[in-house]
From Swiss-Prot:
Entry remark concerning the domains of this protein: Contains a N-terminal NAI2 domain (192-490).
Pfam families: MutS_II (PF05188)
Protein name (record): NAI2-like protein
Signal peptide per UniProt: 1-24
Biased composition (Basic and acidic residues): 171-183
Organism per entry: Arabidopsis thaliana
Disordered: annotated span: 43-83, 155-206
Amino acid sequence: MGRKYVVLGLAVCLFLSSFNEVSCQAEGGIESSNSEFQGSFLEEGEVEVTKIESESQSSSSEQNTKLSMSEENQEDSFDVDKFIESEAVSSREELGQSSSMDEVNRDLEAILDSLNKRDGSDDISKVGESMDAAGIADERRQRLEDIERKLKAAAATNIVVEDGTSKRKSKVEETQEVVKFESESSSASSESRRQSSSSYNSFNKGTGGSEMLGSLGISQSGSWRCYNQDKNGVSEEEDTSIVIPKYDIDSIIKEESTSQGSSSKTSSLIASLTKIVEKHRKEKWSSGVSVSVTKGASSTQTSETVEKLKVTLKKYRGLSARELVARSDFEEILATAARYEELSSASVSHISRLSMYRSVIKEGIKASQRVQLAYARTRLLKEMAVEKQKNVDAELALVKALAERGDMLYVKIFAIKKLISKLEAEKYEVDMTFEKTVANLSRVIEEASQAYEEYHVVVRKWKEEQASEEFSREAIERVEMVWVEFLSTL
C-alpha cells in the first residue's frame, strides 16, 4: 500500500509539472505572437500616420470647418496622448521597440509640447494685448471726447464770429454807401463850393485832411453839419451844429416862372442862387472862425500827441498781421493807429482796411485751430484703426494656429480610430485562437492524463516485475548459499 501511495504521488507531481510546462509553452507562444503582431502593427501605424499627415497637409483648406470638433475633443486628446505615451513606454519595455518608433514618439511629444506652449503663450499674450488695448482705447476715447468738446466750442465761436462779421460787413457797406453818396453830392455841389474852396483848403491843412469826407457831409435829410475837434484831436459833433434846410431848386424856378415873365427867368434864378450861396458862406465862416481859433491853440499839443502815438506804434513793427489780430489789446492798438492816421493827415486810411480784414483773419485763426483739432482727431482715429487691424491680425493668427492644431488632432483621432479598429480585429482573432487553444489544451490534457495512466500501469507492472525479480534473486542467492554449504560439507 505504501508503495502504491508513493507511486500515486509521483504520478500527480509528474502530471502537474507537465501541465505547467504546457501552460508556459502556451503563454510563450501567445507572447511571441503578440510581440510579432504589435511590431508589425506599429510599423503599419507609422506608415499610415505618414500617409494621413500628407493627406491632411493637402486637404488643410477643407478641414478649417472642423474647429468646433477640435474644441470638444481637446480634453480627450490629452488622455489619448497619455495613453499613447504609456502604450509606447510599455511596448518599449516589453517588446524592445525599434529606433524608428522612438523617433516618431519623440516627434509627437515635441509637437504636443509646442502646441501646449503655444496655447499658453497665445492666451497670455492675448490677455496682455486685450488689457493694453482696453487702456489705450479708454485714453483715446477721452481724447476724442475732449476734441469733440473743443470742436463744439469752436463751432459756437464760429457762429458768433460769423454774426459779428456779418454785422461788420453791413456796417462797412453802410459807410461805403454814405461815402459814395457824399462823394456824389460833393461832386454835384462842386460849383457852389468852388468860391470858398481856397479858404477852406487852407483851414483844412491846419486841422487835418483825414476828416475831409466826414467834416462836411450831406445826409439824406439834406442837412449840412460842421464838426469841430476837441483838445485831444478827436472829432466830435457839436451840440449847436449848423443845420441849413435843403432848398428845392425846382420849386424856386417854378415860383420865379409864375411870378415873373420868361425874359426875367434867368436873372431871377441867378439872384436866388447867389443869395443862397452868400447866406451859406456867412453862416459857415461864422462857425468856422471858432473852430480855427480852437485848432490854432491846440496845434502844438496835436504834434506832440502824434509823436507819442508814432513811438507807441513802432513797438509793434515785429508783429505780423495774424499775431496782431490774435492779441488781446488789438482794439486798443487799432484805436491808437486810427487816431494817429487822423492826427497825421494820412492820405490813405490803412487802419480802416485792417479793421475790415480783422474778422477774416480771426476766422482764419479759428479755422486753423479747427484744422488742428480735426488733424488730431484723424490721427487718433488712424491709431485706433491700426490697433483694430493689429487685433484682427492677432485673431487671424490665433485662428490659423487653432486650425492647424485641429488638423493635427483630427489626424491623431483618425489614426487612433484605425488603430483601435485593428486592435479590435486582432483581439477577436486572439480570442478565437484562445478558444481553439483552450479546446486543444483540454484535449491534450485528456491525452496526457491517459498517457500518465498508461504510464502508471506500466510502472506498476515494472515494479511488480522488479519485485518478482528481486524475490527470485534472493531465492537464487539462498540457493547458492545452500549449495555452497553443501559443497563445504563434502
